[in-house]
């Protein structure tokens, strides 16, 4: 035993070395796993020198054993006896003169040491586990006298039948008994845990047995304890916890009796037990019952009077619990009301519940909601949400016509009592929406954000519900609030609330919560008032002198999202000028500055103002200081600044593209400084990280300006329409963008060894395509050549292939583009295969290295990169198919690489087979290749260049002899582990069937209907099937299915064929 204690002391020591601690832990773990663990640790528990930590560890071991040991096992009985003996010893060591032990867990004069709480909780867990495996018929009645034995052992038998005060009992024993009861409920009754069906069935059987045998006994003990523990707050809290936790699954009539409830109520008077009492009462009223019974229970409990009697000057935790209790009563009443509303027979129950809510409970709910502490307010949200939902069904007059809420409302005329409730609720919402006076918008960002997310957003939802129920009342509440606060000049919190309410008001109009006809929304009274408020706000005497981030950002969020309500003269000019002030984009506060840079562009992209070049020149001169790029590789925050700066470049591009004079010389004012910076970067003797990052940022800015110009020129719904772009883009703009393309290429040629520059060059170049259209092709040829001569990483290559796919899609009908790809296809494919080879080598090396460490790692990072690269590459091949350019693969320039392309499509490793998306893509490409040039001739009728390529002899035979073995090897080779029951494998099987059907179809002759003359069938029957010793009966069936079934039918046949063969 001394060795165990020594090991525990070392393991728990803060000064022992790691090696020594490891030895101690290993020793304890060895004992824990030994056959005689129960005996060893049972003996240790009885050792007088055992420490509390040691006893905790021993109890933990025995507790685990109690769950793991099989039923009727002799060790389980031995463990039971050890646990009882330990409990008996603890009670003897802690004994005193009964109920005088008031400091449970703390000791008191004349009392020997009481086990600490963590030990008592572990004792409770041990007995709960013994209960779980020994109690009741489900455990063959191994210990069905569990509760009776414990009651006798812990010295609380005097409480069994007593219904009076002054009863003597062992306080420590009662403490342990209640903890055991609570732990048992955690095992079998706690709904917070998700349990398996088998465990839940056992739990139900245990509860059923308890209900019959012992629950009444327990309820008597609890009641007796409540009568005798008013001076023992720890014990009182424990018994209240027991009552609250068991109430959900025991007969409520055992508890809900006048004397029992009255005794529970007494504990609301004592500060130390108010919290536990409130929690207990919450559980009681949450008991599932029929609506009429629940109403009767709530009426009998009369909890609101009790809550009022507790007063308001309470500890915050108690106040929160009282608010939660009040909310619980109100919520249950509203649920009763909701359940009865649609039943004519239960209308009286519904009305009675509603009357209690309106006249009794809701005033208290609103009082708690209006409390200064948000944590108290929050407790009432679930009732308000539920009750408003009920009121919508009864009274709603608003909501979008045709919406569910409008259709389902009974439209009962609202009475004064309910109208008064809504009015009071609206007033509380307005009161609580205001940011607390203790908050500072500069220093308390997190606190304010939490308030907005958890409190304000919910209050807004309540406001919106009021709007739907009674639009006129909502209109009066919110307009009064805005009227009183919009002209505020001193308190920023009041003005911020006004702006927030303006946003809410505008949203309610936009979402038509007022229920007006769609055509009348813009001319409705709310919309006209909103326009008036926006004008008032724009003419606010002190708003734009405020230096308050929350007010500043809220204002710009409002005017950008709801600028349609701004009806002042020269609206666009007014707003853009406001943006160009220290109140906005030039603010000294970075949060304001960066957010308004984004909102500036969002406003421009939404409204696309048609500005004259004179005003535009003036505006650009104002914001030009913000367009100066200063990259710093050491400052992470500057990257954030640059990301926001890109919004400014896009916004200026949109303004230039949308200018009313269609003049684009003004673009030079933005681009010339950028070009000058690029020249400095290019001429730098050393391309250090500063220079590289500066170059990257400038290229990104140029591309973003280009995107903005195109967005300004072309309507949003036509941005991808090349013909529309061609009509609106003038020659001078094309010349400027050709110059931009040249600048990008020159820069790229100097910096192509840097990955960030390659990314930026590709990004910027892609943004030039919509404007230059097919005039981009000569520049693209040079760009692609530089890329192919660069040391690309796999991810980059994937992105680059995506860029090539974009080019093919856009210019598939351009002869120059066709010739470009005719020249570049082979180099691109070779680059892909070179990278794949490198990744295979890295993957192999990585796997060997990790295997040597004893780990079986199949998928390495290199393998994943290879799969992603293959996916991009197969996507490029699919692009040639979908854009009718497959003849490219048959040209003189590319026919030599074609065998390698096809071999790659026909070769897979075991790991690649289970990459379903990649496999599906590759087989789909192969099927299309067979369909379009499987015979050696390009047969795609839409391919404009098909007539210009010669036939490739032997291609048909190649496809047959390589594809057919693949069709049978993938499903049946053991190393591929192909599971036809798996969804991914079934998809691959379906694709393989289409591959075989394609081979069969291209070899069909229109003049010869003899299936045996089909080259695909001949290879199967004469060469492949005999080679693999395929049964002749199946050969006939398989060939018949291939020849007579259509593609969909053969797909089903092939899947079933694989299924049958693998059985």
From Swiss-Prot:
GO terms under biological process: tRNA processing; tRNA re-export from nucleus
MF term (GO), any: small GTPase binding
Gene Ontology CC: one annotated term: nuclear matrix
Record localization: Nucleus; Cytoplasm
SUPFAM superfamilies attached to this UniProt entry: ARM repeat (SSF48371)
Keyword hit for Lipid metabolism: no
Key words, A-Z: Cytoplasm, Nucleus, RNA-binding, Transport, tRNA processing, tRNA-binding
Pfam family, one: Xpo1
InterPro entries: ARM-like (IPR011989), ARM-type_fold (IPR016024), Exportin-1/Importin-b-like (IPR013598), Exportin-T_C (IPR045546), XPOT (IPR040017)
Top-level taxonomic group: Eukaryota
Keyword Cytoplasm: yes
Family: Belongs to the exportin family.
Its job: tRNA nucleus export receptor which facilitates tRNA translocation across the nuclear pore complex. Involved in pre-tRNA splicing, probably by affecting the interaction of pre-tRNA with splicing endonuclease.
Protein name according to UniProt: Exportin-T
Gene (name only): LOS1
């Amino acid at each position: 035993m001394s060795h165990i204690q020594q090991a525990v002391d070392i393991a728990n020591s803060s000064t022992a070395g790691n090696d020594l601690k490891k030895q101690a832990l290993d020793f304890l773990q060895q004992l824990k796993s030994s056959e005689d663990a129960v005996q060893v640790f049972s003996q240790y528990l009885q050792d007088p020198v055992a420490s509390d930590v040691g006893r905790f560890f021993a109890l933990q071991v025995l507790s685990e054993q109690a769950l793991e040991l099989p039923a009727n096992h002799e060790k389980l009985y031995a463990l039971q006896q050890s646990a009882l003996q330990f409990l008996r010893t603890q009670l003897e060591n802690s004994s005193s003169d009964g109920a005088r032990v008031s400091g449970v867990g703390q000791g008191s004069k004349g009392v020997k040491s009481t086990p600490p709480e963590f030990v008592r909780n572990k004792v409770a867990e041990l007995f709960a586990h013994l209960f779980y495996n020994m109690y009741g018929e489900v455990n063959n009645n191994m210990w069905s006298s569990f509760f009776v034995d414990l009651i006798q052992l812990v010295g609380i038998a005097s409480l069994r039948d007593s219904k009076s005060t002054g009863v003597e009992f062992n306080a420590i024993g009662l403490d342990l008994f209640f903890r055991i009861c609570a732990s048992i409920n955690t095992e079998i009754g706690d709904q917070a845990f998700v349990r398996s069906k088998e465990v839940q069935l056992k739990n139900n059987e245990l509860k059923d047995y308890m209900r019959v045998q012992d629950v009444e006994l327990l309820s008597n003990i609890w009641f007796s304890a409540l009568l005798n523990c008013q001076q023992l707050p720890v014990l009182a809290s424990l018994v209240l916890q027991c009552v609250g936790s068991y109430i959900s699954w025991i007969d409520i009539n055992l508890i809900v009796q006048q004397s029992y409830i009255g005794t529970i109520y007494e504990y609301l008077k004592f500060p130390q037990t108010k919290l536990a009492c409130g929690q207990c009462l919450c559980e009681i009223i949450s008991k599932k019952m029929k609506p009429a019974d629940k109403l009767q229970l709530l009426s009998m409990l009369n909890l609101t009077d009790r809550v009022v009697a507790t007063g308001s000057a309470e500890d915050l935790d108690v106040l929160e619990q009282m608010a939660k209790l009040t909310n619980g009563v109100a919520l249950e009443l509203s649920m009763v009301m909701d359940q009865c509303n649609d039943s004519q027979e239960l209308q009286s129950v519904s009305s009675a519940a509603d009357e209690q809510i309106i006249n009794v409970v809701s005033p208290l709910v609103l009082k708690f909601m209006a409390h200064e502490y948000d944590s108290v307010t929050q407790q009432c949200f679930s009732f308000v949400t539920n009750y408003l939902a009920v009121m919508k069904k009864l009274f709603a007059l608003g909501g979008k016509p045709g919406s569910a809420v409008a259709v389902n409302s009974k439209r009962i005329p609202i009475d004064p009592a309910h109208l008064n409730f809504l009015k009071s609720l609206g007033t509380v919402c307005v009161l609580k929406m205001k940011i607390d006076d203790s908050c500072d918008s500069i220093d308390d960002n997190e606190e304010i954000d939490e308030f907005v997310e958890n409190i304000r957003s919910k209050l807004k939802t309540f406001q919106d519900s009021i709007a739907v129920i009674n639009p006129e009342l909502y209109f009066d509440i919110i307009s009064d609030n805005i009227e009183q606060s919009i002209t505020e000049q001193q308190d920023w919190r009041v003005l911020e609330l006004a702006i927030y309410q303006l946003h809410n008001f505008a949203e309610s109009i936009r979402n038509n919560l007022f229920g007006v006809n769609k055509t009348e929304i813009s001319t409705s009274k709310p919309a006209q008032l909103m326009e008036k408020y926006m004008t008032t706000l724009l003419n606010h005497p002190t708003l734009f002198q405020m230096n308050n981030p929350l007010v500043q950002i809220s204002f710009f969020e409002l005017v950008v999202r709801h600028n349609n309500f701004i009806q002042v003269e020269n609206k666009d000019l007014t707003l853009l000028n406001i943006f160009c002030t220290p109140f906005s984009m030039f603010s000294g506060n970075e949060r304001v500055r960066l957010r308004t840079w984004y909102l500036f562009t969002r406003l421009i992209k939404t409204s696309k103002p048609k500005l004259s070049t004179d005003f535009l020149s003036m505006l650009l001169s104002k914001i030009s200081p913000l367009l100066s790029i200063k990259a710093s590789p050491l400052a992470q925050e500057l990257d954030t600044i640059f990301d926001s700066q890109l919004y400014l470049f896009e916004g200026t591009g949109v303004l230039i593209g949308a200018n009313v004079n269609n003049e684009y010389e003004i673009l030079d004012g933005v681009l010339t400084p950028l070009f000058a910076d690029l020249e400095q970067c290019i001429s730098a003797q050393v391309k250090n990280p500063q220079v590289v990052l500066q170059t990257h940022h400038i290229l990104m800015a140029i591309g973003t300006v280009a995107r903005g110009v195109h967005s300004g020129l072309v309507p949003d719904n036509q941005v991808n329409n090349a013909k529309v772009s061609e009509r609106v883009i003038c020659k001078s703009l094309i010349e400027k963008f050709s110059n931009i393309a040249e600048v990008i290429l020159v820069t790229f040629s100097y910096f192509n060894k840097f990955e960030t520059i390659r990314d930026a060059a590709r990004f910027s170049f892609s943004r030039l395509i919509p404007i230059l259209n097919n005039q981009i092709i000569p520049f693209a040829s040079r760009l692609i050549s530089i890329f192919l001569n660069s040391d690309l990483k796999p991810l980059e290559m994937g992105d680059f292939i995506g860029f090539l796919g974009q080019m093919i899609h856009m210019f598939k009908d351009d002869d120059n583009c066709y010739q470009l790809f005719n020249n570049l296809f082979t180099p691109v494919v070779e680059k892909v295969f070179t990278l794949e080879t490198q990744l295979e080598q890295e993957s192999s090396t990585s796997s060997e290295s990790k295997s040597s460490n004893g780990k079986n790692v199949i998928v390495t990072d290199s393998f994943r990169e290879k799969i992603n690269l293959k996916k991009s590459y197969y996507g490029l091949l699919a692009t040639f198919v979908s854009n009718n350019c497959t003849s490219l693969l048959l040209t003189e320039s590319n026919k030599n690489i074609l065998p390698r392309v096809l071999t790659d499509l026909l070769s897979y490793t075991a790991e690649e087979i289970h990459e379903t998306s990649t496999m599906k893509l590759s087989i789909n490409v192969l099927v299309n290749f067979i369909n379009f040039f499987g015979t050696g001739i390009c047969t795609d009728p839409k391919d404009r260049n098909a007539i210009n390529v010669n036939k490739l002899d032997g291609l048909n035979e190649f496809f047959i002899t390589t594809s057919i073995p693949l069709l049978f090897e993938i499903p049946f080779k053991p190393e591929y582990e192909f599971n036809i029951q798996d969804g991914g494998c079934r998809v691959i099987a379906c694709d393989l069937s289409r591959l075989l059907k394609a081979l069969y179809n291209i070899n069909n002759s229109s003049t010869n209907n003899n299936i045996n003359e089909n080259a695909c069938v001949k290879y199967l029957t004469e060469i492949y099937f005999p080679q693999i010793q395929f049964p002749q009966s199946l050969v006939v069936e398989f060939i018949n299915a291939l020849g007579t079934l259509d593609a969909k039918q053969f797909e089903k046949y092939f899947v079933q064929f694989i299924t049958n063969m693998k059985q």
